[in-house]
């Protein structure tokens, strides 16, 4: 959430930021309501001052043995009007707050201009796509032929975009999760969290999923609880409405969780395989830091996610999202895209974002600085990585002509020394 004072005092900057994003927000209505609120505040303060004067005068007259019936009536009338206007101000506050919750973050000055994903600049690439010497098969065919992933029964039991891992498939999924967690905790300094997979509405508002993206969430019927779309939600809200010790920043957490997404806007895209499932596993990286450090921390977080792909030997590239492709809460984002031979293109496997104080302001996460004053932390997160997409990339990039799949060396200790599936 943006700072109310900033939005009020910098209308040109806010309009420019929204124009850069290519989004439309009813700012005229916001400023109209804000002006109405300020006018009512001025009026009610005048009334309260008058009521205080009248009250003091009534008290003075009573001490001298005199009655003041007209003043008593005036004070009652003032109190009634004050109550009414206070209620109107409260209603305006709620409407303004709702509008603020639907205004996206302001892009950082380093974010490139662009209308959409096609205009995201490539920052760097790593690795070289393999020359197979045969036509590579898609991961869903590999998984089915090796009998390690069952999409048909996933559809029978749960519906479209669900699957079963079985045998070495289940073990490979678990190996990838444990490998990622071990790497981030042992080498990158993250403290592991195992979070709840269900959160309340305040948590979803805190990280920016609600109210704007309600249709993409799985809500529990009859309750204000939601299945998490990412571990970002519970881990960021771990410190909601808290004041952190500035000397302990940055705080680094990693977390494995299942993730649940309705994918309401993804109809017709990646309908086969593991790329776009309603339920999938992910290892998330979350940081809380001082404002002046957040963009350095974004570079480090991105490098931590990249290290997973490097150790697995998976070719990838890093793109920086342009203004038109930037997520609602993010000030700047790098996407990691892994090479998938069957698509003959790179597919997103991680988004690493700096949210500046946008989430912290919504969630009330502050720290006490060296002067003893509180200010909002900056929050960052990124996938470290999406597990299903990592498995898909392994199956496709490590497939062999005989139908088997070579297990990446980094995963063999987690697979009981197994070097090949099939």
From Swiss-Prot:
Assigned EC number: 6.1.1.11
Binding site for L-serine: 230-232, 284, 383
Annotated InterPro entries: aa-tRNA-synt_IIb, aa-tRNA-synth_II, aa-tRNA-synth_II/BPL/LPL, Ser-tRNA-ligase_type_1, Ser-tRNA-synth_1_N, SerRS_1_N_sf, SerRS_core, tRNA-bd_arm
Catalytically driven reaction(s): tRNA(Ser) + L-serine + ATP = L-seryl-tRNA(Ser) + AMP + diphosphate + H(+); tRNA(Sec) + L-serine + ATP = L-seryl-tRNA(Sec) + AMP + diphosphate + H(+)
Group of enzyme by EC: ligase
Keywords: Aminoacyl-tRNA synthetase, ATP-binding, Cytoplasm, Ligase, Nucleotide-binding, Protein biosynthesis
Pfam family membership, one: tRNA-synt_2b
Pathway participation: Aminoacyl-tRNA biosynthesis; selenocysteinyl-tRNA(Sec) biosynthesis; L-seryl-tRNA(Sec) from L-serine and tRNA(Sec): step 1/1
GO terms assigned for molecular function: ATP binding; catalytic activity, acting on a protein; serine-tRNA ligase activity; transferase activity
Location(s), subcellular: Cytoplasm
Disulfide bridges in this chain: none
GO BP annotation list: selenocysteine biosynthetic process; seryl-tRNA aminoacylation
GO CC terms of this entry: cytoplasm
Binding site for ATP: 261-263, 348-351
Function summary: Catalyzes the attachment of serine to tRNA(Ser). Is also able to aminoacylate tRNA(Sec) with serine, to form the misacylated tRNA L-seryl-tRNA(Sec), which will be further converted into selenocysteinyl-tRNA(Sec).
Record's comment describing the protein's domains: Consists of two distinct domains, a catalytic core and a N-terminal extension that is involved in tRNA binding.
Family of the protein in this entry: Belongs to the class-II aminoacyl-tRNA synthetase family. Type-1 seryl-tRNA synthetase subfamily.
HAMAP family in UniProt: Ser_tRNA_synth_type1 (MF_00176)
Assembly: Homodimer. The tRNA molecule binds across the dimer.
Designated name of the protein: Serine--tRNA ligase
Organism whose genome encodes this protein: Pelotomaculum thermopropionicum (strain DSM 13744 / JCM 10971 / SI)
Upper taxonomic lineage: Bacteria, Bacillati, Bacillota, Clostridia, Eubacteriales
Gene name linked to the record: serS
């Amino acid at each position: 959430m943006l700072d109310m004072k900033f939005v009020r005092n910098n209308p040109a900057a806010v309009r420019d930021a929204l124009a850069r994003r290519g989004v439309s927000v009813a700012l005229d209505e916001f400023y109209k309501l804000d002006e109405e609120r300020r006018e009512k505040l001025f009026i009610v303060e005048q009334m309260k001052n008058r009521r205080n004067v009248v009250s003091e005068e009534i008290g003075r007259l009573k001490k001298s043995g005199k009655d003041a019936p007209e003043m008593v009536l005036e004070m009652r009338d003032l109190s009634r009007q004050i109550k009414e206007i206070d209620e109107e101000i409260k209603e305006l506050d709620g409407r303004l707050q709702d509008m603020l919750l639907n205004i996206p973050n302001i892009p950082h000055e380093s974010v490139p201009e662009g209308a959409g994903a096609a205009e995201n600049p490539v920052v760097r690439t790593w690795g070289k796509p393999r020359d197979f010497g045969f036509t590579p098969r898609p991961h869903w065919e590999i998984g089915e032929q090796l009998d390690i992933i069952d999409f048909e029964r996933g559809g029978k039991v749960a519906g479209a975009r669900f699957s079963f891992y079985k045998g070495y498939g289940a073990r490979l999924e678990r190996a990838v999760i444990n490998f990622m967690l071990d790497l981030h905790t042992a080498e990158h300094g993250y403290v592991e969290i195992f979070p709840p997979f269900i959160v309340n509405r305040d948590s979803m508002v805190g990280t920016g999923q609600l109210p704007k993206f309600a249709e993409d969430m799985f809500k529990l019927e009859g309750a204000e609880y939601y299945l998490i779309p990412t571990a970002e939600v519970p881990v960021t809200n771990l410190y909601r409405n808290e004041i952190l010790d500035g000397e302990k920043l940055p705080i680094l957490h990693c977390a494995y969780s299942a993730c649940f997404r309705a994918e309401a806007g993804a109809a017709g895209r990646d309908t086969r395989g593991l790329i776009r499932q309603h339920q999938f596993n992910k290892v998330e990286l979350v940081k809380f830091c001082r404002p002046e450090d957040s963009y350095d921390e974004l570079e480090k977080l991105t490098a931590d996610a990249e290290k997973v792909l490097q150790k697995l030997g998976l070719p990838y590239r890093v793109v920086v999202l342009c203004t038109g492709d930037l997520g609602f809460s993010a000030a700047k984002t790098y996407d990691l895209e892994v090479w998938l031979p069957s698509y003959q293109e790179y597919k997103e496997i991680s988004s690493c974002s700096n949210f500046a104080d946008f989430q912290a302001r919504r969630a009330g996460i502050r720290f006490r600085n060296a002067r003893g004053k509180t200010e909002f932390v900056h929050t960052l997160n990124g996938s470290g990585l999406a597990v299903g997409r990592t498995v898909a990339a392994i199956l496709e990039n490590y497939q062999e002509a005989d139908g088997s799949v070579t297990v990446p060396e980094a995963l063999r200790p987690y697979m009981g020394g197994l070097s090949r599936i099939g």
